[in-house]
Amino acid sequence: MAVESASRAIDGHTGRYFYSTGTATRYYAAQDSFITQVDDVSSTALTLQTSASGDGIFDTTWAVGDYQLEPLNGNVDGLAVPYTRIRAVENYLFPVEDEQALVKLTAVFGWASVPISITQACIIQASRIFKRLDSPLGIAGFGDMGAMRVSRYLDPDVEQLVAPYRRLRDFV
């Protein structure tokens, strides 16, 4: 239970989840004619469709050469990461109409494998949650300086370990 709670706390703090949900279909509103921000995609095997006329009928299926997954090579600052953006290339453009979700993506969402630092952060936070049972009302004990309190927030070491994976969402 502590491990599951720690894992969900890390997911919430980073704005992403570090497991694969399998293949699913999701809908997005393009940021502009060239870029669509998407949830974490762990595989290049996907189906991308758009509604060219804006009527919600996804009648245009894009070929692999019509788009580019980013970050390129699934790597940022030496860290292996999933794809989070799709860039239109060649002859296609994303439809942009009043922030409507006119992009349909069928893909494997999530992460292919859990990064080592996320696993370590989960272990640290889980042990903290487990030890929380020994600190009723957040008081871990009394020392020379008075009561020692246990924070209800993420452990500072955990925050540092997960910081490179934090994602701020700015898309629909």
Label each PLM-derived region with a short phrase.
Residues M1-V172:
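Divalent metal-cofactor coordination and adjacent catalytic microenvironments
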